[in-house]
Regions:
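Helicase P-loop NTPase motor core of nucleic-acid translocases
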Residues: 1-181
Length: 181
């Protein structure tokens, strides 16, 4: 989309760069902010990115990959990645004249921001943080995607817990079908 409403939607500094946000991504962010606004612009970026990834068929936003290799994770152009870096860096308070590069920090700033994202707090929040590592979240899900993943995991674990006996003549039957090799 070349033009987006200004309501909490981060805009690239360069007009030559356009974000890949869909109207649904933007509506998701507006919905979240209409129910509980956040003053942290990284929260807005995370909400947009989670929705964007869901639209691409991914169940979650992997915060480690976002930090270490955003181009691979998002499949964006170099210009879009640079705009994301610039937007993210300008979103965080800093004392120095030039904003820090969040992608070169020693601790994942995306995970730190997600940790206090208001839309991922509580049992019925619209987003879920998962897979804690060193006290920081590793993934951000839309709640429905997280619930679907949990349901699949439970079903697989139930199947794995089921024990059944293998008939004694199974090896014989397999040899008859496939030979000794």
């Amino acid at each position: 989309l070349s033009t987006l409403p200004k309501f909490n939607v981060p805009q690239p500094a360069s007009t030559a760069v356009t974000w890949p946000w869909t109207p649904l991504d933007v509506a998701w962010l507006k919905f979240l902010n209409s129910h509980q606004a956040s003053t942290n612009a990284l929260h807005d970026l995370l909400a947009l990115l989670v929705s964007y990834q869901m639209g691409r068929g991914h169940a979650c936003l992997d915060l480690e990959l976002l930090w270490q290799d955003p181009a691979h994770l998002l499949d964006w152009s170099d210009a879009q990645i640079n705009a994301l870096k610039q937007s993210a860096s300008q979103s965080t308070p800093h004392a120095s004249e030039s904003p820090p590069d969040l992608f070169s920090e020693s601790v994942n700033p995306w995970a730190e921001a997600a940790q206090n994202m208001p839309w991922a707090m509580g049992e019925h929040s619209p987003m879920v943080l998962s897979q804690q590592r060193e006290g920081l979240p590793r993934r951000v899900y839309l709640r429905r995607a997280w619930q679907a993943e949990q349901s699949i995991q439970t079903a697989i674990q139930a199947r794995l817990a089921t024990h059944f006996e293998v008939p004694q003549d199974t090896e014989e039957k397999l040899k008859a079908l496939f030979g000794d090799e």
